[in-house]
Amino acid sequence: MNRQMGRKRLIIYPLCLVLAAAVVVSAAFAAKFIGYKNAPLELSPAFTVTGHTGCMGEKDNSLEAMRAAIGAGAKVVEFDLNFGENKVPVLSHDIPTGGEVTLEEAFRLLSENPNIQANIDAKSTENLVAVGKLAKKYMLEKQLFFTGISEDDVAAVKRDCPSIPYYLNVDVKKGRVKDESYLEELASKVISSGAVGINMHKRAVTKELCSFFKSRGILVSVYTVDSAYDMYRVLSCAPDNITSKKPDKLINIVNQKTNIK
């Protein structure tokens, strides 16, 4: 009997510790969530919400996803750029296999919505000349900008699409975002590249980082912001753009916090 009791204690005690730790973590998370939710909204006048490709449950890189983003109230639609057979520009995250929506189809839809911008996430820069020609054909240069651009891609963008601005994709090191010399290094990299801003993952964004880059005239775009927690947290950092698979929810939060009905 005593052995059985001892075994039960050996099992129950660690479980209690795990549960207690879970409660503490949950409480801390809830406290942070409430803090972000109640934080004042200090967005830039030009703040935009981008509907990530595949938003609102639609298929990635589809015209339906673009229409869904526009219908949800997003002022920017995002899609991936790649090049298929004969280097024809198409909407695809991976190497095209055929049947993809062409960039011309996407541009045709965009031309019907002159108040909407397109965030072209370049997965390849193989034939940007064709992209530039299509942009001119549909007179869309002012409605477009590139993301997904690395330092190695900058020369191709400048050469082949000189009238289309671009954000530099940077893998910001989360552990160094409080290091001003590191931020200065990143800012210099963005400015010297000719980019209008930095495109970064949500995990490393902070209010201080956004403030620092804005003081240098650098726009900050943050992607993969899909949960309510992340929406409130990233909004509290005051970036210039947030890209989300759920633009309707993000827009609703912004409207609630700014008392717009």
Indicate where each model-derived feature is located:
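Phosphate-group recognition and catalysis centered on beta-loop-alpha active-site segments
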Residues: 2-261
